Amino acid sequence: MSRARISNYRKGVAAVALSAALAGAFVVTGPLGALNEARAEAVHVTPPQQAGFADLVEKVRPAVVSVRVKKDVQETSNRGPQFFGPPGFDQLPDGHPLKRFFRDFGMEPRGDSRSDNRRGKANKPRPGHERPVAQGSGFVISEDGYVVTNNHVVSDGDAYTVVLDDGTELDAKLIGADPRTDLAVLKINAPKRKFVYVAFGDDNKVRVGDWVVAVGNPFGLGGTVTSGIVSARGRDIGAGPYDDFIQIDAAVNKGNSGGPAFDLSGEVIGINTAIFSPSGGSVGIAFAIPSSTAKQVVDQLIKKGSVERGWIGVQIQPVTKDIAASLGLAEEKGAIVASPQDDGPAAKAGIKAGDVITAVNGETVQDPRDLARKVANIAPGEKAALTVWRKNKAEEINVTIAAMPNDKGKSGSQSNDNDGGQGETLDSYGLTVVPSEDGKGVVVTDVDPDSDAADRGIRSGDVIVSVNNQTVKTAGDINKAITAAEKSGRKAVLLQLQSNDQSRFVALPINQE
């Protein structure tokens, strides 16, 4: 082979080898190859385009205020710890969900007798002065400075200060308060100033699971923002006759009381009022007054300084399964009238004990609280059509609504003592009864502790005045009413009882052998 050919051959082999080497760089296997491949295919996640709450908070926070309350304390002596709490605080049971929340407002001990004695100050009079008794939250609802807060924040005060988001402190006066819904309205004393304000939204459109943003003054830290969701609707926590709270899981703590809960449109859907907490801090269970309730109350407070509600004057109780069965009702809805108040609107219209109010102006009544809310929302002087269930049929009764009295005293107790005679036993119910001395009903003298009657709260001294709306005067009358109910296919009988001037209904199941 000639030298020229050998040279060309070598060049060709070299070129092939180089090409193979270069190709091998792209097909390397093993750890190095895996590393290169991983780097080439690194995962990249595009973050979701969520606006968050910053824009909302920026707009609404200037309208949220802190509320400071002071009380004019008259000259006193230092006689150990003294406490100042909202009216009725001492009557709240220890387990009440509001008691721990209220304790933050004014429940601070003033003075210490032992330390004062050591300093030689015991029993020395102190001049009158203003002392802080509460702090909470609120929000401005008008350009001229009307502020909504809770009644329990302001109820024990004489002087009020509103602190704006920028730290400005302004005096305010109390326009009106409504203890029944725990709402109050203040007016900032700054006639030349225009305030940023927020509007009430429609809480009826709020669904469980919707976002909610709370802004307030927890522990004195004004302008604090938390978020969560609506956990439940229509909560009754025993705080008042019109409980209809929205439950939220946004962090709400001491000092948030009276602050707003916003929807994502920046409208107020609730007023934060209470928390449930074994520890005193937020555990994700807070309660807000619905905006629909607040708007009605606030409008009246601004216009009149008080709230006027409709009232029909009835003592009512829930319709239980047994009561529904005893009356032939298909559903456990409505409110059974235990006793109409003498000369009250309901009594004048013909409402009787034992009637079940099932609707108001065509709207179904779910339970006693629903009835109370519906009637309260009707202006005094107007007429309302009440649908009542009486003697196995529905009928409509028109009632003229009256204004609710401010305070109704408790009825005096009435003794049901009976010295008398041989009682008759209703074996099927474990009751022993004797005729009442006044001829109105029969008095229970003994109750079998293992009976259905005992389980349903019937006690010695109770007076049975009717069975299935039939007046009874003897044990025989009771047995006749029970027999009639059994023949008609009823599964229970309805007893009307009186005790301490209070009337109530109890349903007892019919023992069918």
From Swiss-Prot:
Residues 300-391, 414-500 form the PDZ domain. Residues 100-135, 403-428 are annotated as: Disordered. InterPro entries: PDZ, PDZ_sf, Pept_S1C_Do, Peptidase_S1_PA, Peptidase_S1C. Coiled coil: none annotated. It is found in: Periplasm. GO terms for biological process: proteolysis. PROSITE patterns: PDZ (PS50106). SUPFAM superfamilies: PDZ domain-like (SSF50156), Trypsin-like serine proteases (SSF50494). GO terms for molecular function: serine-type endopeptidase activity. Might be efficient in the degradation of transiently denatured and unfolded proteins which accumulate in the periplasm following stress conditions. Belongs to the peptidase S1C family. NCBIfam families: degP_htrA_DO. This is Probable periplasmic serine endoprotease DegP-like.
